[in-house]
Amino acid sequence: MFVDEAKIRVKAGNGGNGIVAFRREKFVPRGGPWGGDGGRGGDVIMESSERHNTLVHFRFNPEYKAERGRHGEGANKTGREGVDVLLKVPVGTLVYDDETGELLHEFVHPDERIIIARGGRGGRGNAQFATPTHQAPRESEDGKIGDEKFLRLELKLLADVGLVGYPNAGKSTLISRISSARPKIADYPFTTLQPNLGVVVVGEMPHEQSYVVADIPGLIEGASLGAGLGMQFLRHVERTRLIAHLVDVSDASGRPDPVQDYKVITKELASFGSGIEKKPTIIVATKIDVANPDKLKKLTTFAKRSKKAFFAISAVTGEGIEPLKWEMAKRVEAIRAKAQDPVEEADEIEAPKKKRRAPARKSVR
């Protein structure tokens, strides 16, 4: 389980002011009060979305403000309501009041929608103050102040892609090339002592795609029985949507057969007993800048016979990196589209169903 966090400030719109106005038209003597009410301020709304999987956007854009309501007008016209702001968050996001630490909401299911900061009520115009004994009121109300909150968002991330393979297969180097993650990298086994997380972005706005990659610490023969760094890391693989199985085809590994390397790790995944080995898999030959040609050819042939997607890359030179990034993006998107329930694990307390409001007119993704 990985944790992403962001702190934001949200400000709902203030209500518009009511106004003082009187009806002055020909042939309408003593027209009376005609001042309209102010419009309601816009709300700040949060909605859970399957198409979002990190909080990275909120870290770079920490402030959100809804539009204030317009002031009332003559002819007893109510001011226009302020435009709501819609913030889309990943399923699994927890929303805390950053000042009190109170948990305000947990988004457990897709398409949950809550008002996190409510807009201020519009003030009353003088027409609202008219009575039989007070027929020309000159008082009105200002709009109410909209809610302002400082929030802490926390997301327990489930990786879309798990990078697996023997220690030193190049997983940490790859994740450092395709994302902003900076894991410890050195030329010895078990450099990675805990899963590293990276967010990969492909394409450009407004059509960019993102997915989460986990650099799972190196597995070895017997991992399913606790060997090496043990079963704890197999649990992380279990939660991914797609596996990228990295196989070193250089002579640096000291192992003669890359196909056997692939089979050993696949056997460990199968021995874990939760169907991990059945997940969609891409075979990735690594270190092709210093590849043993015979090893590369053998692994390529095996991948074709196994009808597995196959890519050959060098994280050092960058060869093959871009096609691999796009292939993973395409496959993750297809898996997400097919998923019936993207939340594999929910806490014991389910969020109550919320009443739907009319869709907000301004969306922040």
Swiss-Prot record:
<comment type="function">
    <text>An essential GTPase which binds GTP, GDP and possibly (p)ppGpp with moderate affinity, with high nucleotide exchange rates and a fairly low GTP hydrolysis rate. Plays a role in control of the cell cycle, stress response, ribosome biogenesis and in those bacteria that undergo differentiation, in morphogenesis control.</text>
</comment>
<dbReference type="GO" id="GO:0042254">
    <property type="term" value="P:ribosome biogenesis"/>
</dbReference>
<dbReference type="InterPro" id="IPR031167">
    <property type="entry name" value="G_OBG"/>
</dbReference>
<dbReference type="InterPro" id="IPR006074">
    <property type="entry name" value="GTP1-OBG_CS"/>
</dbReference>
<feature type="binding site">
    <location>
        <position position="172"/>
    </location>
    <ligand>
        <name>Mg(2+)</name>
    </ligand>
</feature>
<dbReference type="GO" id="GO:0005737">
    <property type="term" value="C:cytoplasm"/>
</dbReference>
<dbReference type="GO" id="GO:0003924">
    <property type="term" value="F:GTPase activity"/>
</dbReference>
<dbReference type="InterPro" id="IPR005225">
    <property type="entry name" value="Small_GTP-bd"/>
</dbReference>
<dbReference type="GO" id="GO:0000287">
    <property type="term" value="F:magnesium ion binding"/>
</dbReference>
<comment type="similarity">
    <text>Belongs to the TRAFAC class OBG-HflX-like GTPase superfamily. OBG GTPase family.</text>
</comment>
<feature type="domain" description="OBG-type G">
    <location>
        <begin position="159"/>
        <end position="333"/>
    </location>
</feature>
<feature type="binding site">
    <location>
        <begin position="314"/>
        <end position="316"/>
    </location>
    <ligand>
        <name>GTP</name>
    </ligand>
</feature>
<dbReference type="InterPro" id="IPR006169">
    <property type="entry name" value="GTP1_OBG_dom"/>
</dbReference>
<dbReference type="Pfam" id="PF01926">
    <property type="entry name" value="MMR_HSR1"/>
</dbReference>
<dbReference type="InterPro" id="IPR045086">
    <property type="entry name" value="OBG_GTPase"/>
</dbReference>
<feature type="region of interest" description="Disordered">
    <location>
        <begin position="340"/>
        <end position="365"/>
    </location>
</feature>
<dbReference type="InterPro" id="IPR006073">
    <property type="entry name" value="GTP-bd"/>
</dbReference>
<dbReference type="Pfam" id="PF01018">
    <property type="entry name" value="GTP1_OBG"/>
</dbReference>
<feature type="binding site">
    <location>
        <begin position="190"/>
        <end position="194"/>
    </location>
    <ligand>
        <name>GTP</name>
    </ligand>
</feature>
<feature type="domain" description="Obg">
    <location>
        <begin position="1"/>
        <end position="158"/>
    </location>
</feature>
<feature type="binding site">
    <location>
        <begin position="215"/>
        <end position="218"/>
    </location>
    <ligand>
        <name>GTP</name>
    </ligand>
</feature>
<keyword id="KW-0479">Metal-binding</keyword>
<dbReference type="GO" id="GO:0005525">
    <property type="term" value="F:GTP binding"/>
</dbReference>
<feature type="binding site">
    <location>
        <begin position="286"/>
        <end position="289"/>
    </location>
    <ligand>
        <name>GTP</name>
    </ligand>
</feature>
<keyword id="KW-0963">Cytoplasm</keyword>
<feature type="compositionally biased region" description="Basic residues">
    <location>
        <begin position="353"/>
        <end position="365"/>
    </location>
</feature>
<feature type="binding site">
    <location>
        <position position="192"/>
    </location>
    <ligand>
        <name>Mg(2+)</name>
    </ligand>
</feature>
<keyword id="KW-0547">Nucleotide-binding</keyword>
<keyword id="KW-0460">Magnesium</keyword>
<keyword id="KW-0378">Hydrolase</keyword>
<comment type="subunit">
    <text>Monomer.</text>
</comment>
<keyword id="KW-0342">GTP-binding</keyword>
<dbReference type="InterPro" id="IPR027417">
    <property type="entry name" value="P-loop_NTPase"/>
</dbReference>
<protein>
    <recommendedName>
        <fullName>GTPase Obg</fullName>
        <ecNumber>3.6.5.-</ecNumber>
    </recommendedName>
</protein>
<feature type="binding site">
    <location>
        <begin position="165"/>
        <end position="172"/>
    </location>
    <ligand>
        <name>GTP</name>
    </ligand>
</feature>
<dbReference type="InterPro" id="IPR014100">
    <property type="entry name" value="GTP-bd_Obg/CgtA"/>
</dbReference>
<dbReference type="InterPro" id="IPR036726">
    <property type="entry name" value="GTP1_OBG_dom_sf"/>
</dbReference>
